[in-house]
Amino acid sequence: MFPRSHLVRLVSFLVLTFSCFYVQCATINDLNKAYVSLKTQDTRSQETAIRQALAQVMVKLSGSESVIKHEQFRALSENVMQYVTSTQFVEGDSEQLLVIFNQAKLEKWVKRNALPLWGAQRPEALLWFIEQNNSSRFRTILMDGESNDTLSLLNAAAFNRGVEFILPIMDIEDVTQVSEIDIWGQFIDTLHTGAQRYNTPYTVSVKLQQLSDQSWQLDYFVKSNTELELHQVTDTTKLAVIGKFVDQYTERQATRYALDTFRFVENSQIQQLITINHVTDIVALSQIEAYLTSLSIVENALLLEQRGTTSTFNVKLLGQPQQLHHVLLQGNQVVGITDPEDELNTRLFEYYWR
């Protein structure tokens, strides 16, 4: 039901060998989709399910559960059908409903209410995940090419929050650098060093264990090159502790990367000039305009000049110009020429269209 490629991404050796030199970000393509349970197919049950789907999608778009506590959310929920694109039952499961929303309309609502908005480009993390069986004490490491109930629960939780993890492939290079004891013991430096080959900005390590019939404990840390956080969650089921872990991780990342849309409400958007080279025809120009306006940080993009194969745009931003630069590079559609950290270049950013 939850497409693995959009959630916990399993990376092959070839991808690692030829990976890009810059920090990886995932493009999350299903932010406007939600799966919800539907026990009966009467009209009232469907309306309730669609409202639940709306809440799930709004949390994904914002990155924070605070969005559904906003004073205007109830009014949005009461008019939910204005934002629904389609609904369909999941193949082979008549109790699961897939609801797809108009993402652009929902993002406009988020901006109008000055709530955080998290774009589709989201930082990836290499996830070392180990679980210990309560009875046998046997330990399992989640890795490339394998599937089990724990991974399914993780996939579902990640889909519901719009985040992505990369699992280690555990080839000879991985097992030489990182052992089962390292993961179980959560040896921070060893795991962070072992994750560097995956070129992700974050390393996450999870240790999951069942303490008794109705007691589960999940210990985890999140580390970047400059930050470290350690946490522990407990609950009565595996489903609950995995859900809490993903919720906490997502809320953490959203506070760092989601856009503050107050500029939209105050009509104080920042304007930035950018030029894009290698625009060879009208088709490429149309693709560029569509791409720029699809970015959450961009309120609108106006073509100012076309000179030869170089297009100059005035872009109205909801965030800082440096944020736009990083989003553009993460999207892998352009090659940067300008260094935005150079004060002499801050007025005009320059790129090549791929």
Q: Model-predicted segments: where are they?
A:
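Bacterial N-terminal signal peptides that target proteins for export
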Residues: 2-11
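A short, hydrophobic beta-strand-centered structural micro-motif
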Residues: 79-89, 166-169, 182-219, 328-346
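N-terminal segment of the mature soluble domain
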Residues: 50-72, 123, 127-134, 140-184, ...
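C-terminal soluble interaction/assembly domains
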Residues: 249, 270-354
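Signal peptide-directed extracytoplasmic domains
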Residues: 70-131, 136, 140-145, 149
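Short, well-ordered alpha-helical segments
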Residues: 31-76, 241-253, 283-294
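Amphipathic beta-strand/beta-sheet edge segments enriched in Tyr/Trp
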Residues: 30-39, 198-244, 325, 348-353
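N-terminal signal peptide c-region/cleavage motif recognized by signal peptidases
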Residues: 20-23
